[in-house]
Amino acid sequence: MTDALIFLAPGYEEVEMLTVVDMVRRAGLVIDMVSITDTLEVTSSHNVTIKADKLFKEADFDSAKMIILPGGIPGTPNLLAYKPLTDKILEFKENGKLLSAVCAAPTVYGQLGILKGHKATCYPGQEVNLNCAEYLTEPVVIDGQFTTSRGMGTCLLYTSDA
């Protein structure tokens, strides 16, 4: 049984991803690192290769309560471009499950149009892509089923809140 799924796309931000995974596991929850590529090994924006726990097709979406998206460039655009993931994000939204994202990644939710009517935050300069009701400069914003965070420097606070 999986509590959360965090997705690795080529070019993800490794500190954001690993901080979230580490803190969630320290809290005693099950989080799976899921590759959206055809291999478990995924390389970050800073050329660090990490082995995911599962491929996308193996992820346990039924038991997962939360989707988490780490930021990074080109990781964030790669997440948005992966239709199987965006379909699952829309399904989670419809079913009232939790959606969470750090740094530039909240813009994935924004570009899917699901942040409308919600408050959110993201990496400074990316807010034009949030398409939300209200952009906040807080380190972490929780609004309904969404938790968003500004970036790498806010990850410890983010994981304690999420």
Predicted region positions:
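Extreme N-terminal starter segment of soluble prokaryotic enzymes
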Residues: 1-5
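Short N-terminal binding/cap micro-motifs at the start of the first secondary-structure element
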Residues: 12-17
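A short, Lys/Arg-enriched amphipathic alpha-helix followed by its capping loop at the start of a domain
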Residues: 20-29
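Flexible gly/pro-rich beta->alpha loop and the following alpha-helix that scaffold active-site loops
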Residues: 32, 36-96
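Catalytic nucleophile loop
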Residues: 67-71, 89-115, 120
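Phosphate-binding/catalytic loops
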Residues: 98, 140-152
